[in-house]
Amino acid sequence: MAETKANPFDMDSSSFDAEKYLERLLKDCSLKQIMDTEAAVVKDTQTLHSDMQTLVYENYNKFISATDTIRRMKDDFKQMETDVNLLMTKMQSITTFSEQITGTLQGTRSQLCRLSEKHSLLKRLQFLSTLPAKLKSLIEEQNYAQAVQDYLHAQKVFAQYGRQPSFDGIQRDCDAIMADLKEQLRSDFQRAGNTAQSLTEIGELLLQLDEKTSDLASEMLTCAGKRLHEQIVMLQDQTERDMLEFVDMGIDGFLNDLALVVTSYFDMFVAKHYEHERDDFQENALQELNVFLNQNIEKYLTLVQDRVESDIGYGDTQVMLRALDRLHRRLQAMRNICRGLEVQRNTVSIIISAAHQLCDAHAKNLKDHFADSLSAVRLSLVSAKSDAAAGLNLGDLISNLYVSMVEKIKGVLQDLLIFLRTDWSFNIKAEHKGALCVEGIRENLLIGFLRHIAKVMCGFGDASSSSPPNLLLVLSKTCLELEQQGVHILIALVDDLYEIDSENSATLTHETEICAEMRETAQSLLDAYVRLQGTNISQMLRKSVETRDWLNCLEPRSVRAVMKRVVEELGSIETVVASLYEANTNATSGFRTTASSDSSRKTYFSNFASTSKPQYRSNWSNYTPSQLESSYVSNIHRLFSERVEIFTSVEFTKASIIMGIIKIGLKTLLECVRLRTFSKFGLQQIQVDAHYLQMNLWRFVSDENLVNFLLDEILGSAVQRCLESVLMEPNAVEIICERG
């Protein structure tokens, strides 16, 4: 590459030409620029001059320091040269002296080597000569490991000098001593009560003494099994300890010994190769060790499971799970102690089983609590002074029963949530059986208990049950509350706590199924209540009809007492029902506060008709006997054409409930009247009673036409069964009823 052309105008260049630079500067620049250039050049010159002075001063100091250093080095080298010369003189003297020693000892070196070898041999011979006595001493001190080590060390010497007659006796003595030791070790190996550590140590010594490997392997597992069985028996007696202490004892004793036996057996018989054994010895030994390990773990875990089962429902669940978590961690560690070993059973199955059993225990506790709550409700109803007083308290009874059940279930669900804590080393939801167990908490515990509630409550409504009416009303209302609120709250809670996707599961019970069962139970109990109260009213009416001589009656002067009693009883029932069910105030149903215009007139009964048919009333007092007789066929036709359903399901309203009771009572009265024969005064008494009922029953019902129809039927049947069909004057009936 060509060199850069020299620039005469560059002041930093070696080819700088001052004359040319000034000539160019005067030619190209103005006066001001020339003066500025001059000032810049002067400034740079001063700066360079200052830097040069600084550099000179610094280098001068360094030069002075270097001069001093060189001077000192010269002085040091002079002293060092003197020392080196002295060292060389001494090294020459040492070399000369060494050559003299070598020459002097050359003749005795071989003799010293021979003496050293003889000394070593004499020491070995001395070891052999004292070996029998030493072995006996070590055995007496029970220092078996040192005795075996010394004997094996001597075997090498015997192998070298064993043909010498002088050593033959020593070898026989040593062999005899070690044979006795071998028998003693074998006896100790088979003795019960040995720890796993001692079994391992004795097994190692027997192997060194050429015990048959296969026999020793089998015997080691047998003896270890006996020792482990003793520990199992000992653990069975530890019933007074809590679960955590019990598991700790098992880990520190049984499992640690088992792990020691397994690792020792593996190192002695599986990891080593023995020339004199069969080729499949190691494989068979590993298989036997696997069987031994799993058999003993199965025994121990069975014992743990029995203990868990005995503690379920009595001990602290958290303590139990802490113990099982600790055991699970220990077994997880045991799975990795030796390559090729497989632990088949783990603690998760025990934990899942414990969860199932705890669910069963909680289910039993829930059922017992529910039974106690029902007993408390029945006792409260029995101790109530009157139905009216009971009615005021029914709301509290229902609230207490409902809240106690819901809160008890919530508490149980929270208690069982401890199985799913994230700090446990196990995760039962990861197992298929564990996932089924979690779903079982929902299905078997919650859903099962809700169905148990429905079943038990429904049983109170059976005809064979002698349940008090108010109890049926309380249970019906409680079921209705569960259907409207409780079921949804509890199922949503369990799905949220246990992360269950019940909406997309085909196997889990849906909320609507349980709600339907609860509503069906509530309906059944309410219908039973209506039947029971209707039956009570019916019995009063039936007895009043059957016990009276209707052919020899006096002219009626008042309403019969039983009719007043019926109205009073209906009033008490209405008070109780009103405390639980609000009246429906729409136009077609609800509690009546005023009578219809028809019933307020001085006429008595209108034939039952639907709203699309015109109402009409029957004035029996205006009919002649022939007219009454001719109306018989029309009444029969009306009976079959306008049938009234008596035992139908009622609605969850006060008006519907009271109407159902009234229908049963009036239907019973109708049937009783049809079976009796009446005189004129008997017919008139029925007329007075029916009018009294019409005057008082309208306020209980929402459909006055239905009541009037049934009362029409009653009076019509009495007319048809009367020997002299003459009714009282309407004014007279009105006066008697108002006075009564």
From Swiss-Prot:
<dbReference type="GO" id="GO:0042147">
    <property type="term" value="P:retrograde transport, endosome to Golgi"/>
</dbReference>
<dbReference type="InterPro" id="IPR016159">
    <property type="entry name" value="Cullin_repeat-like_dom_sf"/>
</dbReference>
<dbReference type="GO" id="GO:0007041">
    <property type="term" value="P:lysosomal transport"/>
</dbReference>
<dbReference type="GO" id="GO:0016020">
    <property type="term" value="C:membrane"/>
</dbReference>
<dbReference type="GO" id="GO:0048193">
    <property type="term" value="P:Golgi vesicle transport"/>
</dbReference>
<dbReference type="GO" id="GO:0007030">
    <property type="term" value="P:Golgi organization"/>
</dbReference>
<comment type="subunit">
    <text>Component of the Golgi-associated retrograde protein (GARP) complex.</text>
</comment>
<dbReference type="GO" id="GO:0005829">
    <property type="term" value="C:cytosol"/>
</dbReference>
<protein>
    <recommendedName>
        <fullName>Vacuolar protein sorting-associated protein 51 homolog</fullName>
    </recommendedName>
</protein>
<comment type="function">
    <text>May act as a component of the GARP complex that is involved in retrograde transport from early and late endosomes to the trans-Golgi network (TGN).</text>
</comment>
<feature type="coiled-coil region">
    <location>
        <begin position="322"/>
        <end position="344"/>
    </location>
</feature>
<dbReference type="GO" id="GO:1990745">
    <property type="term" value="C:EARP complex"/>
</dbReference>
<dbReference type="GO" id="GO:0000938">
    <property type="term" value="C:GARP complex"/>
</dbReference>
<dbReference type="Pfam" id="PF08700">
    <property type="entry name" value="VPS51_Exo84_N"/>
</dbReference>
<comment type="similarity">
    <text>Belongs to the VPS51 family.</text>
</comment>
<dbReference type="InterPro" id="IPR014812">
    <property type="entry name" value="Vps51"/>
</dbReference>
<keyword id="KW-0175">Coiled coil</keyword>
<feature type="coiled-coil region">
    <location>
        <begin position="65"/>
        <end position="87"/>
    </location>
</feature>
<dbReference type="GO" id="GO:0032456">
    <property type="term" value="P:endocytic recycling"/>
</dbReference>
